[in-house]
Each structure stands twice: as C-alpha cells, then as structure tokens.
C-alpha cells in the first residue's frame, strides 16, 4: 500500500493506459510479469505477447495480475532480454516497472541483488536493447540510479502520477 492505494492496482492501471496507447499507435509490444522464490523458482508470465492484439483477454490478464513473492529482477530481465533479442526490430525497449528493491530469500538481498540486476541491465544493453526502469519505491534513490544509470530511470514517490506518466516516459524514451 502507498498513499492509501494498493500499489499493484495503480501499476495495473498504468499498464492498461500504456498498452492502449501503444496499440493505438501500432507499436508492437508485450507485457510480462514475474515473481520468484529462490533462484530455482523464477516465474515470468506472458500477460500480452508480441503480435497479440489488445482485447478483452489481455485486459482480463492485466486485471488478474496478483502480488507475487519476491523480486529477483535480474533473472526476469535476462529472460525478457532473450525474448526481445529474437524480435526483428531495430529499436527494442525493455521497460522495467517495479515497486521495490531486488530481493529474494536466498541471499539475493542487498548488494548482491542490486549488482545482479545491474549486470542483467548491462547485458541487455550489450545485446542492443534500450532499458528504462520505473519504480514507485520511495527509497529507490539509494539504489535505482546505480542499477539503471543516468537518464535511464524514473522514480515516482507519488503513485497517483504513474498511469499518466508511463505513456509520457515511453514517448520520451523512444524519440
């Protein structure tokens, strides 16, 4: 909860706004959600796949996203990077929307989680992806700039701005 709103509900609203905008512009995109419980149990779910039209099924999948367990961001970034590398497009963007610091119950806490996520971001960029991070974590100034780098992240301590901000961030990052 943040500012009397469930963070996940606001994130889902922001995803809906963004996917409607991208679909209206004809920009091919996919949406993935992830959760983890140890390094051997990282789940990345496809909410909307590339080429899949935005319709009632996708909207229901977005609305059905539930809170997961832990936030092993590095593994999720590597998984989605592999999918994006398969895409034939010249411009490929990986936008990471998260509500917290990289963590898990098996030593993926603190410095290790931050360094692994930072390395996954570097690997994605080396593979030709543009990567941009978005978070609503009020403490993100302590680690988010280090993970994503200068000009490649946005921190929203006021969560109510997120739904309008995601489409604006996309326009800014892709111009």
Please state what every model-predicted region is.
Residues 1-175:
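Acidic, glycine-rich A-domain
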